[in-house]
Structure formats: C-alpha cells, structure tokens
Design a protein with these regions (language model features):
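Mature extracytoplasmic/periplasmic domains
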Residues: 301-377
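Sec-exported extracytoplasmic/periplasmic mature domains
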Residues: 41-45, 64-69, 87, 91, ...
Length: 397
C-alpha cells in the first residue's frame, strides 16, 4: 500500500526497494526534557524497557528520582528476544514494550526488522548535533563497542607487535605461524564475520596495507571457482579471508578465557586474541598482562552501535522518549543515566561527553563506522566462504 511505503522513515522499504537512513527528525525530535516529562505524567506512567544490556537495570533508581511519578521497568533480554517479543506484541495488538534496545552488526535488523512496523525511530535533535552523522545512519546510538586484538604486555614490553591485519597471520621463515591465534569461531560470531566482510568491501585498502607492510604487491592464492556464487577475482579481502581460514587457530567461546590465553603466553610462544574490547577489564580485575592493539592498518575494527527505539503503538510515547534522552546523557550530556554504560571498552558517541574510562578515545582507535548495507549485501556469501574454507583447513581437523 502507498501509505505504508511512505510511513517508513528508517530501514529497507519492501515496496520500493529503497533504503532510508538516519537521522530522521519529527515533532518529537524538537521536544525538551521538561516538555516530555510534563507530557509523560499525563500518559501511562510505567515505562517498560526491553534491554540487551543488564547495565540498564542500574538506571532505574536514578531515573525515578530525577522524574518523580514515572516508574521504570527493565527487562534484560538477548537481542533476538527483544525483537521477537516486540513482534508478538505487535501482531497481537497487546503492546507492553515502550523502549527497545537492539544491536545490528550485519545489517539484518536494519533490513529485515525496521520495516515490520514494530520499531519507531527517535532522534532527539539537540543530542544528535553532538554525534557524528555516520553514527546516526542506522539508528539512534546508546554507545559504541568493538572487537579488538589483544597482545601480552610482558612478552612485548615495547608495545604492540602488530600494526596491520596481515601481520596477525604472518609466517616465520620456516613456514610456521608467528603467533598463536585465539578467537571465537569467526563464522558463528556475526560481529567478527562482518569485520571480515568489510575487508572484502574495502579490498583496495587491504591490498594497499599489504604493500605498505611488505613493500610488494599481494599475491592472490584463493580459488574463486570453489563456490556456486560469484566470488570477486583478485580481491584482497577475499584473499585475507582465505589465508585466515587456513591458519592454525584455537576457538574459545568465552571472552575471559580468550584474554587469559594471551596472558598465559610468552615472548617465545607469543599469542594474540580477538575479543570484545571490554575484556580489557581483566587487566585491572585479575592482573592480566594484556592490552589492545590500536590503529591497525587498514583499520582496527568496526564500531558496533547499540541502538534505541520506541515501540510502535506505545502508550507512553513521551515517557519512552524521555528515557531514551536520559540514558544518552540528556540535553547537557550530564545525566546519571549514561553512567552505567561508561566502562572500558564502551565508548560514548557524543562529542560533548568526557570519556575518562578508556585508555584510548574513540577517535584514537582507528576504528570506523559499520556500513551495514554493504555488509548485508555480501554477508551470506562470506559466511559460506568461511565455513567451506575452514572445513578444508588441515590444521583445524
């Protein structure tokens, strides 16, 4: 229907095949905290939040103190549950959720969920003026996180031993691998696979980074005829995927155990691991000798953004938006609501909020915004390539 098509303000329009990107501003975007609070008191005063981060629980008390008369209820769910519960509520017309927290790392949520009439975008204009436009493209962000390569600081007292992604899989003169590699199974971890997909989309940069690292052109050794879909020829990102899939790796599902493996490694038997940046917490909590590898060429990581939405059909439309503003810092970036999300390995995306927790600021990481549409287009193929090539790896049998 015509009306439905033009109602979509963010996401993939099934009728026209068009993508609509943020930020999208409407009347709500202009309203202040005070205006929203006043309005919130006249509607259903219980605000239900479907959160994917248990840290959201820590906001209940301070929010209710700041805004007397409003009652905040937080449900701690996983990402798929947030979406599936919201869908059931929408389909039955029995809408409980008011605010939804989602995370999209491969474009699936943007392309397949935004257009189901379940999520309503909300971009508060004053706050968005402090956020990079590329971080508003796929939703309104709560904070950024990412995966990082960790190294052992005792084994490498002079600093990180690698400066490019190619060096991670480097071989010694005798053909053996330079580093022991610990990671989650890439093919089952959509955030990691998306990162590898981005290298295929940015193949020119991968080729250049190889040349910068080794002073010669990359040789292509993968066989594009392995698949019944079109694999690009002479693509440095595909070459990287192929070489990485043939490396010797140890898959560990738990992030704390991944960084422990690096902590236990030595200068003679050096190790690297790919884990979520927040695992750096083990350095202070458990005394691990670990640090992040920063500014890897061509880029360190993709920024994965936690996004906030209003549930379509909510009976607390003002209260829901007031809460979204509150946990993203409020008008001045000073609200208590942001505090639980400030930890090492989480980065605020506002330029007017001081980030004291992180050893490196967002601008210093060498990470980049995640282009979800480009990743979504090739993600299934990349998954097939990884899975098939990994199955052919003699070291991983």
């Amino acid at each position: 229907s015509e009306a439905a098509a033009s109602d979509l303000h963010l996401g993939y329009d099934l009728n026209t095949g068009e993508n609509y990107y943020g930020p999208y501003y409407d009347d709500w975007s202009e309203k202040t905290d005070d205006e929203l609070y006043e309005e919130a008191l006249t509607e259903d005063t219980t605000i239900n939040v479907y959160a994917t981060s248990s840290k959201m629980m820590k906001v209940e008390e301070s929010f209710e103190e700041t805004y007397p008369g409003l009652d905040l209820v937080v449900f701690d769910l996983d990402n798929d549950e947030v979406l599936s519960k919201a869908k059931i509520e929408h389909d039955t017309g029995n809408i409980t959720a008011d605010v939804l927290q989602t995370k999209d790392v491969n474009g699936n949520v943007f392309h397949e969920w935004y257009n189901q009439d379940i999520l309503e975008p909300y971009f508060p204009k004053d706050i968005c003026s402090h956020i990079d436009e590329e971080n508003l493209k796929y939703g309104y962000p709560l904070y950024a996180s990412q995966s990082m390569w960790f190294y052992n600081t005792a084994a490498f007292p002079d600093g990180q031993p690698i400066h490019s992604w190619w060096e991670i899989i480097e071989k010694k003169d005798d053909g053996t691998q330079k580093y022991h590699l610990f990671t989650k199974e890439i093919g089952q971890e959509s955030a990691y696979l998306s990162l590898f997909a981005s290298f295929i989309n940015n193949a020119d940069e991968m080729a250049q980074s190889y040349k910068d690292t080794y002073g010669k052109d990359l040789e292509y050794t993968y066989d594009a005829s392995d698949f019944n879909f079109e694999v690009p020829e002479k693509n440095a990102g595909v070459e990287y995927l192929w070489r990485f899939s043939q490396a010797e790796m140890t898959f560990i599902g738990d992030g704390d155990e991944l960084v422990l493996a690096v902590h236990n490694s030595t200068a003679d038997e050096p190790a690297l691991c790919l884990a979520s940046a927040g695992k750096i917490g083990n350095r202070d909590e458990s005394g691990y000798n670990i640090a992040w590898c920063l500014n890897l060429e061509p880029y360190t990581a993709l920024l994965n953004l936690e996004s906030l939405f209003i549930a379509k059909g909510t009976n607390s439309p003002a209260g829901a938006r007031l809460f979204v503003r509150y946990i993203t810092g409020g008008a001045d970036g000073q609200s208590e609501g942001m505090k639980p999300f400030k930890k090492e390995g989480n980065w605020p995306v506002r330029d007017d909020v001081e980030d004291k927790k992180n050893p490196a600021q967002l601008s210093e990481l060498g990470a980049r915004a995640n282009d979800l549409s480009a990743i979504y287009a090739i993600y299934p193929d990349v998954q097939d390539m990884w899975t098939y090539w990994l199955s052919k790896n003699p070291k991983m049998k």
